[in-house]
């Protein structure tokens, strides 16, 4: 089965009289445009997103018919939670994490990142309130360079030059 786009969110579908099958993925697989996986019920799934910037989210429906529905399930993992005491501290910790080019998630006014012992110790030593938790990382901050084309017409420089004409 080849999937080219997301059908919608699970809450938008009536699952009555349908088998709900889950496609389990790790948080870092949610941004991959091309991948092959097996659902929990053994269905082979090939994801081939044609548009750049498409990302799988927890409970996205990637296939639906009258009998079955396949839903994305982002697997929980060990994570670092930083609970900023103020908006200024939120900005500082996001800057520090982003400066190290680490993946960062914002959920429930907390900053989360995949657990790595050295990063946990560094954040704690820097005075931030940190905890190690087992949770689902779902709301990634788009802090890195966006996917882009390699043709001349898609470069930012080319677009600015066209505006200036």
From Swiss-Prot:
GO CC, any one term: cytoplasm
SMART domains linked to this entry: UreE_N
Keyword set, alphabetical order: Chaperone, Cytoplasm, Nickel, Nickel insertion
Predominant localisation class: cytoplasm
A single BP term in Gene Ontology: protein folding
Stretches of the chain forming a coiled coil according to its record: none
Pfam families attached to this UniProt entry: UreE_C (PF05194), UreE_N (PF02814)
GO molecular function: nickel cation binding; unfolded protein binding
Places the protein is found: Cytoplasm
Entries under InterPro entries matching the protein: UreE, UreE_C_dom, UreE_N, UreE_N_sf
NCBIfam families the record matches: PRK13261.1-6
Protein role: Involved in urease metallocenter assembly. Binds nickel. Probably functions as a nickel donor during metallocenter assembly.
Entry's family note: Belongs to the UreE family.
UniProt name for this protein: Urease accessory protein UreE
């Amino acid at each position: 089965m080849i999937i080219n786009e997301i059908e919608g969110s699970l809450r938008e579908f009536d699952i009555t009289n349908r088998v709900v099958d889950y496609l389990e993925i790790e948080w870092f697989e949610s941004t991959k445009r091309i991948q092959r996986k097996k659902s929990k019920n053994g269905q082979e799934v090939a994801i081939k997103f044609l548009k750049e910037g498409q990302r799988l989210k927890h409970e996205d429906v990637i296939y639906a018919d009258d009998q079955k529905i396949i839903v994305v399930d982002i697997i929980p993992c060990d994570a670092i939670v930083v609970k900023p005491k103020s908006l200024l501290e939120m900005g500082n910790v996001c800057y520090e994490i982003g400066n190290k080019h680490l993946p960062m998630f914002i959920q429930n006014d907390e900053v989360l990142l995949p657990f790595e012992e050295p990063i946990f110790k560094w954040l704690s030593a820097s005075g931030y309130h940190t905890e190690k938790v087992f949770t689902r990382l779902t709301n990634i901050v788009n802090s890195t360079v966006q996917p882009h084309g390699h043709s001349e017409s898609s470069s930012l420089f080319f677009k600015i030059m066209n505006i200036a004409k």
